[in-house]
Amino acid sequence: MSRDPKLSLSKFLECLNEIEHEFLRDKVEHRPVLVRKLQELQQKTPKHVAKLPHEPEMIQQIHQAAHRIDIVAQAFIRFDQKFVSLCSEIVHDTTKVMQEANVVSPGEGCRNLSEDLPAYHMRNHFLHTLENPYPTQEEKEGLVRLTNESTARIRPSNAIRPPLEVHQLTLWFINARRRSGWSHILKKFAREDPSRMKRLVRAKLSSSNQSTPPSLTSEKPSDDLDVVLSDNLGRPLTLADKQQFEDDWASMISWIKYGVKEKVGDWVYDLCAASKKTPKPGMPRPVTTVAKRHPARKTKPAAKPKSRTANPRASTTPSIDSTLDSSKLESTPELSMCSTADTSFSTFGSSLSMSHYNPFQDGNDILQSPTVKARGNRKVKALPKRAGKQQPDEVDNGKIPFLCLSVAFV
């Protein structure tokens, strides 16, 4: 076309159709060629338009071809613009999702936090918001969703475990602030002032060459840690204060990264789940009642009543005759009136004679021991005397009031 100095309507239409077909083929390497052809055609057309014959039909076809090229060119321009816009949106959305999920590089993740922990996302959020670990409602919902998704993805065998809820996450953050020591640092080294705690966290992160949260990068540089500590304490900083703060800070970071309770492996949960007996099909589900939940108090069994049967009572008075066997002795009701408590001669009256006291044939035996030889070689031990009224006839006859009244022999 450039070689032909003379331009006709037919050639002009042919050039437009060629450019249109090349546009539709959409080859990247042809785009500079198409641009150059359009530029040459634009330069030559004004010079020859006035000299061209008036052919309405040919002119109409040229207009239609030019309109189609314009539509195709605008469509490609929009495609390119939309492609750039979509790429930008994808990059922005991906960055936002990664920030919400707090995804870090594999090396840093292995050093800082284990993704296998059930509370990984909550701990990571706590670690990135140390100056104010109070998530908003929107952040809580996002953390709950991420935790449930990651738990279902990492441990599909534990799908029976109920999903995390927002109120459980709220309780976790309340306990985390207290158990990690964050509340202790806020109270002791920041006077329970959130603004002072914010300055303290920024100063500590800057002094330890740790990355600060994104929300703090736009603010003024953090102060020196010693200056902030001295200002928060309201007195000159001592080595003991500095060491105490460093110990509390290290303990807090260690708890956030590696919770003691969550260091337990999945096998513990599997073991606990396996230990629970599954009910057999068709068996009724046991209902836990108050009586079953709290077993009845164990009561001491009632003591059996002691037998009131009177044991045979023998005299506790030591026997003078130790050679005699006392294991075969018995007491009888007839001997209840006899007394062996006092067998000495001191009880006798001075006016009485021993010749009047001879109730037994063997007087020497009865004086030596309260044991009496009964019929059939049965030995009977006398019981202590029971006091009784003295009979006047006995006194008159010269008998002793302390004598045994009756002795029965079996």
UniProtKB/Swiss-Prot annotation:
Q: Which domain of life is it from?
A: Eukaryota
Is the Nucleus keyword given for this protein? yes
**Places the protein is found:** Nucleus
Gene Ontology terms, cellular component aspect? nucleus
Bias (Basic residues) occurs at 291-307
Q: Where is this motif: Nuclear localization signal?
A: 276-308
- Positions of region (Disordered): 203-224, 278-335
Give the region (Not essential for B3 function) as residue ranges: 333-410
Query: Where is the region Variable domain between B alleles?
Result: 1-110
Pfam families per UniProt? Homeobox_KN, Ustilago_mating
Q: Spell out the molecular function terms from Gene Ontology.
A: DNA binding
**What CDD domains does this protein map onto?**
homeodomain
Annotated region of DNA binding: 107-184
PROSITE patterns of this UniProt entry?
HOMEOBOX_2
Q: Which GO terms describe its biological process?
A: regulation of DNA-templated transcription
Highly conserved between B alleles: where is this region? 111-410
Where mainly found? nucleus
Keyword Iron-sulfur assigned: no
Any coiled-coil regions, as ranges: none
Compositionally biased region (Polar residues): 205-219, 312-335
Q: Which UniProt keywords apply?
A: DNA-binding, Homeobox, Nucleus
Role summary: The B locus has at least 25 alleles, and any combination of two different B alleles yields a multimeric regulatory protein, that activates genes responsible for the pathogenicity and for the sexual development of the fungus within the corn plant.
> What family does the database annotate?
Belongs to the TALE/M-ATYP homeobox family.
Query: What's the protein name?
Result: Mating-type locus allele B3 protein
